[in-house]
Amino acid sequence: MINSLKIDAGEFEKITPLTLDGAVPWNENARYVKNEKVGGDPYHCAGLYYMQEPSAACVAPKAEAKRGERVLDLCAAPGGKTVALAAAMQGEGILVCNEPVRARAQILLSNIERSGVKNAVVLNAYPEEICDYFTEYFDKIVADAPCSGEGMFRKNAEEARREWSEENVSLCAARQQKILDSAAKMLA
C-alpha cells in the first residue's frame, strides 16, 4: 500500500524499484507487487509504502474514516490498516491504535513512526480494559480480530494444519466476541 501521507501514487510508481502488477481495485493506493522481499528497500524503510495482503487493503476504504473523526483501530498490529486509516484522515482527528500483545504493540509503534503518522496514539491493553475510558467515544472502529489462521492454508498449508484445531477455532470465536462486545460499547 502506498503511503499517501508521504507520497502520491503516481509519484511512487515513477520511483519504485518494485515490480508492480496493477492496481488493487478496492483501494486507490494499493498495488499488486511481484517481488515481495522489501526489508532493505530504502523506500520501505522511509515509510513510502507498506506491504500487506490485498484483502487487508479493503479495510480503510470500507471504514470511510474522514478528517477530524475519532477512530479506533482495536487490534492494530502490525499497523498497515492503521497507516491507511491515518492517510484517509489526512492527519486530522484522533486515531487510537490498540494492540494487547506488548511485543506487537512495539512493532505497531515502529511502523506508525516510520510511516509519518502524527495523529495516532498507541495503547497496549485488552479491549475490555479500555471500554470504561472511551464509552461511546469513537466515530469509527476497526477490529481485525485475531482469527484461527485458516487463511494461512493458502500460504503455508503444512504449518496451518499443525496449528489448526477445533478447540483453537472455538477459543478464537470467544475472543472475537469479547472484542466485538467491547467495540460496541465504545462506538458513539
Whereabouts are the PLM-identified features?
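S-adenosylmethionine
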Residues: 1-188
